Amino acid sequence: MKLKKITFVLIVAIFAVSTAFAFQFSPFVEQTFSPTGADSTKSYTIVNDSDESIAIEMSTLIRDQDSKGNELNKSAANYFSIVPSKVIVKPQSTQIIRVQYKGPRTVTSELSFRLRAEQIDYSLGRQEQNQSMFNFLYVYTASVYVAPSKIVESVVVKQVTPGVNEDGEQVLNVTLANTGNVHQILTEAELTLLDNNGNRVILSGDKLPGIDGSNVLARKIITKTIPWPKELPYPETGSASYKAQITYSK
């Protein structure tokens, strides 16, 4: 499976107390750990290029998905060792963070996590007259995976059903199943639909909102709702049936 660029989520929270400073966190690609050996440990770098010390707290989260593909998280503290997990980074300096996987040594299906670098309030030595109304604190959230020894890549359409959304609009519910054992990013996805009357349509790009470019974690089944394709007659009764296939760039 080719290496894909990481998506870092930058969350800016506003707090009243003092002025805080942004930091840089790298690498900028998703990291895949091995359950054992040298690749069970990875290094990250925090760069503080400001003129003030900043405080950073590191943590890991289990990454899961609900039936709609929304991300769910809970602590993964038992899976990783992070050294240091809390650090004061001095002005114009860097700090190396070492993250080691400590979870199960036998992994048959990819494990998905988030690595979180969170700036926490740090006001030691600042004078009250230099304080401002807002404190901008930054959080970087990175993708982390623990790979199985053998990789199987496969996402299939489990079911498609017509429906009506809360606004009364005709929609198509598409249920996708990742039958492989690693996450799949549905880049350049194409969905081919065929109804029992022989009508056929191929959907891609902006006709697949929530599907094209989405990440389906290993062994997960998710349902996405998209607008009903105008090229396909909407069924007047519940007797319609559909065949569907999805392709994407791996």
Task: Describe each PLM feature range.
Residues A22-S50, P84-K86, S154-T179:
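Beta-sheet-dominated interaction scaffolds and their linkers
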Residues S75-R105, R200-P233:
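Intrinsically disordered, low-complexity Pro/Gly/Ser/Thr-rich segments with frequent PxxP/GP/PP motifs
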Residues D51-K74, N181-R200:
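Short acidic, flexible loop segments centered on an aromatic residue
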Residues D121-L186, N197:
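A charged, solvent-exposed segment within the mature domains of Sec-exported extracytoplasmic proteins
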Residues I46, Y101, A117, L176-N178, ...:
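Hydrophobic beta-strand positions in extracellular immunoglobulin-like domains
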Residues V17-T19:
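N-terminal signal peptide c-region/cleavage motif recognized by signal peptidases
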Residues K102-I151, E231-K250:
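Terminal connector regions
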Residues M1-L10:
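Bacterial N-terminal signal peptides that target proteins for export
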